């Protein structure tokens, strides 16, 4: 991306030349600044957490650093800096409805593992914001923990901030801890965006819930150990963990209203408008769809580039939900046919400077998006028709809740996910009996389990598996990795060994090495996706046969997969 790109964004209301630095420039400036302070600049970690089952997706700059902070691993250097790609979906229902919510963001951070502490951290933060970026010091306000006198002295005496401009807050705002373990106070830096973003109240100041004073950088000082009972002792090794949202910084530097107006997001947002043939800021309902698609296609692109595939569970389901929400809102805007890959191309163009792997994997990303859109388009039209009929019946009966049985019918028969049913109905003032849905789901699972025991896995004839060469085995590596490449060793339909499977066929795929856990020991097997650039296979169950063979039972969603193909 070139600096000129930061000046091409415009809204439907007015043309506005963006000020100073683009997102890619800010990222580069931050990393280079901390490299000049002796930090090792690491590339962003994958969105898939490594050896951390507490997280579904990386959601902060600190998350991949946990092994270094806990001492489980030795950091490559005591001073490290990163720009970490992150996904948070806790507020997914609000994405699009407001201009402040999003699922994808980048977190700038500098970290010290037993090296420098408060003085350097705060002075460098101030130096970067005021001298490197050039923000007005008079619009910056630090906050500290109530009794953190050390931080106060640094801000007041070393940096020269008047005492009345330093705000003291309690534990809820300025102390970082999660139960027992390392913890400590933090110091945040706020930026005053001006009266037009304020609430108008006479007491509006730092800490107000309005959009005038926004927190842009948080410095966490890990200096205590909490024993879990409220007793704190000083840590021998004190650490620094800081975080600053790149997109939020860009809104300030570029003097724009929201994260959807910063240069890279604005270019993507404008592409959405171009593809849909609509304008931004003309109609609020249209704006919701524009913002949602902008956010979701960006998140989806980054998730797929990290090897996450659309599935019905875990992080794969997060991806599937993002793609399908974007696809549905594209239809609401009047877009015909597949369009997400075209938008993903804009994501890649805007972010490849910082994430070159996007360019390297773009064809794979496009294939996954197209396959998922194709699969979704087969279900959504019929599902919407059936849901509309159910709505009419509820309206006639003056009911406000869709029964769990009907919601499950949409899911089981027409492939209509519960969250999509909920979203559509909530827009019209209805709700769903989720408890009833779960009961119907459990009944179906029990019936399916009983049927499998009678008919030998998904209806397949056991003699098909008996024909497989006894020398064929599968290495299970799911404890260490959730996704990797492997070679196909055997393929079957429900009745015979085959050399390939094509779209619409049911069958079983065996590979050399798999991350899929098989049904055994009372635990359900994994589901997911096996794919190549030419085809996608939906794994509906994983079974384990004699001799250590793991069979992935399911159906071809699109394209073709052949024996000896390298799949992911």
Segments the model singles out, each with a brief description of its role:
Residues 2, 9, 14-568:
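A glycine- and charged-residue-rich anion-binding loop/surface
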């Amino acid at each position: 991306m070139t600096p000129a790109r930061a000046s091409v964004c415009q809204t439907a209301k007015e043309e506005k030349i963006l000020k100073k630095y683009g997102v890619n420039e800010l990222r580069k400036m931050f990393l280079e600044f901390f490299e000049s302070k002796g930090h090792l600049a690491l590339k962003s970690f994958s969105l898939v957490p490594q050896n951390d089952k507490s997280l579904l997706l990386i959601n902060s700059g600190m998350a991949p650093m946990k092994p270094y902070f806990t001492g489980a691993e030795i950091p490559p250097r005591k001073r490290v800096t990163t720009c970490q790609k992150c996904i948070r979906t806790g507020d997914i229902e609000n994405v699009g409805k407001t201009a402040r919510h999003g699922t994808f963001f980048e977190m700038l951070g500098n970290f010290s593992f037993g090296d420098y502490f408060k003085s350097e951290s705060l002075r460098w933060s101030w130096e970067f914001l005021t001298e490197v970026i050039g923000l007005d010091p008079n619009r910056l306000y630090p906050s500290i923990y109530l009794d953190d006198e050390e931080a106060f002295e640094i801000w007041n005496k070393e940096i020269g901030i008047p005492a009345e401009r330093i705000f003291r807050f309690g534990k809820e705002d300025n102390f970082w801890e999660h139960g027992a373990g390392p913890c400590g106070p933090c110091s945040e830096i706020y930026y005053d965006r001006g009266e037009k973003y304020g609430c108008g109240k006479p007491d509006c100041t730092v800490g107000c819930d309005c959009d005038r004073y926004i927190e842009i950088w948080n410095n966490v000082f890990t200096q205590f150990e909490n024993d879990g009972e409220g007793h704190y002792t000083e840590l021998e090794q004190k650490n620094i963990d800081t975080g600053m949202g790149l997109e939020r910084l860009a809104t300030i530097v570029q003097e724009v209203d929201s994260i959807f107006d910063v240069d890279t997001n604005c270019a993507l947002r404008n592409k959405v408008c171009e593809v849909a043939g609509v304008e931004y800021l003309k109609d609020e309902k249209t704006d919701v769809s524009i913002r949602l698609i902008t956010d979701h296609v960006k998140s989806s692109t980054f998730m797929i580039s990290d090897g996450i595939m659309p599935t019905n569970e875990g992080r794969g389901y997060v991806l599937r939900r993002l793609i399908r929400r974007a696809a549905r809102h594209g239809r609401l805007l009047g877009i015909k046919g597949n369009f997400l890959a075209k938008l993903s191309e804009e994501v890649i163009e805007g972010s490849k400077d910082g994430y070159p792997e996007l360019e390297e994997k773009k064809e794979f990303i496009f294939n996954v998006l197209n396959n998922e859109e194709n699969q979704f388009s087969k279900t959504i039209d019929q599902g919407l028709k059936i849901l509309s009929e159910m709505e009419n019946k509820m309206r006639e009966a003056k009911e406000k809740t869709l029964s769990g049985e009907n919601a499950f019918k949409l899911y089981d028969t027409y492939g209509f996910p519960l969250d999509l049913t909920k979203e559509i109905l909530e827009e019209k003032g209805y709700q769903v009996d989720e408890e009833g849905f779960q009961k119907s789901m459990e009944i179906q699972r029990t019936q399916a389990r009983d049927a499998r025991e009678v008919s030998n896995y998904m209806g397949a004839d056991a003699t098909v598996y008996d024909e497989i060469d006894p020398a064929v085995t599968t290495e299970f590596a799911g404890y260490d990795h959730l996704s990797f490449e492997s070679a196909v060793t055997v393929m079957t339909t429900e009745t015979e060994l085959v050399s390939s499977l094509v779209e619409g066929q049911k069958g079983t795929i065996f590979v050399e090495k798999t991350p899929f856990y098989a049904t055994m020991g009372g635990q359900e097997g994994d589901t997911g996706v096996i794919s190549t650039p030419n085809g996608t296979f939906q794994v509906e169950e994983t079974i384990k046969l004699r001799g250590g063979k793991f069979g992935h039972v399911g159906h071809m969603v699109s394209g073709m997969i052949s024996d000896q193909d390298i799949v992911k």
